UniProtKB/Swiss-Prot annotation:
The lineage of its organism: Bacteria, Pseudomonadati, Thermodesulfobacteriota, Desulfobacteria, Desulfobacterales. The gene is nifH. The modification ADP-ribosylarginine is found at residue 97. This is Nitrogenase iron protein. It catalyses: N2 + 8 reduced [2Fe-2S]-[ferredoxin] + 16 ATP + 16 H2O = H2 + 8 oxidized [2Fe-2S]-[ferredoxin] + 2 NH4(+) + 16 ADP + 16 phosphate + 6 H(+). Belongs to the NifH/BchL/ChlL family. It comes from Desulfatibacillum aliphaticivorans.
Length: 274
């Protein structure tokens, strides 16, 4: 089983990218579990047809310790298994701790057992803050492979660089590696070239450039992935291509994060900060 975590700054399109990629992989016959590690609990919505899933933390709060796997795991599009860790009540507690609690519970309940015959476990992780809890999938070796969703916008690249620093910190102990950058385009000038250059400086690859298309929003309004909503659309093929590239990817690196001056120079060289 490959354990993959998707990181990236808030609002960059991590959950959308993850769910569409998972839909592409499940079309290829892969068995996948998606674990949402974001207090918003929107990491599985499109796979479940908009069904608001009861989170692990809510279930624990309401049921106590007496929880079955089916209480916290739902079956979504093409047989994908969907779980949301959820978060604490606003203003109380630490969302990062919630992720730790959730993943530990899933392990205890046998969600990762060989009998489940999983090909992939995907963690969709809130990514601006590489605080202890959110870094947990990396730190504890729960995920071995990281993909960072990025765009040509300054804050997205800044967050990606920070996440890379987190990977370096835990790479030696946990064996975690960076698999590549996924560029979720915002139609910034010279975006593709800039992210390719950024990836090269980090020592990794831009595994795929996902063009911006309103079909993504249209599918989301209909509570579906693009692959389910309009399978013949060119955007569905983009996600299928990304899924195939991830499935075939053997590049795993410990990244070399940039100094802030280098990052700013990159932005200036490609015209965004001019």
């Amino acid at each position: 089983m490959r354990k993959i975590a998707i990181y990236g700054k808030g609002g960059i399109g991590k959950s959308t990218t993850t769910q569409n990629t998972v839909a592409g992989l499940s079309e290829m016959g892969k068995k996948i579990m998606v674990v949402g590690c974001d207090p918003k609990a929107d990491s599985t919505r499109l796979l479940l047809g908009g069904l608001a899933q009861r989170t692990v933390l809510d279930t624990l709060r309401e049921e106590g310790e007496d929880v079955e796997l089916d209480d916290v795991r739902k079956v979504g599009y093409a047989g994908t298994l969907c779980t949301e860790s959820g978060g604490p009540e606003p203003g109380v507690g630490c969302a990062g701790r919630g992720i730790i609690t959730s993943i530990n519970l899933l392990e205890q309940l046998g969600a990762y057992a060989d009998s489940e015959e999983l090909d992939y476990a995907f963690y969709d992780v809130l990514g601006d803050v590489v605080c202890g809890g959110f870094a947990m999938p990396i730190r504890e070796g729960k995920a071995q492979e990281i993909y960072i969703v990025v765009s040509g916008e300054m804050m997205a690249m800044y967050a990606a660089n920070n996440i890379s620093k987190g990977i370096v910190k835990f790479a030696e102990a946990g064996g975690v590696r960076l698999g590549g950058l996924i560029c979720n385009s915002r139609n910034v000038d010279n975006e593709r070239e800039m992210i390719e250059a950024f990836a090269a400086k980090l020592g990794t690859q831009m595994i795929h450039f996902v063009p911006r298309d309103n079909m993504v929003q249209r599918a989301e309004i209909n509570r579906k992935t693009v692959i389910e909503f309009d399978p013949a659309h060119s955007q569905a093929d983009e996600y299928r291509t990304l899924a195939r590239k991830i499935d075939a990817n053997e590049m795993r690196v410990i990244p070399s994060p940039l100094e802030i001056e280098e990052l700013e120079k990159l932005l200036i060289d490609y015209g965004i900060a001019a």
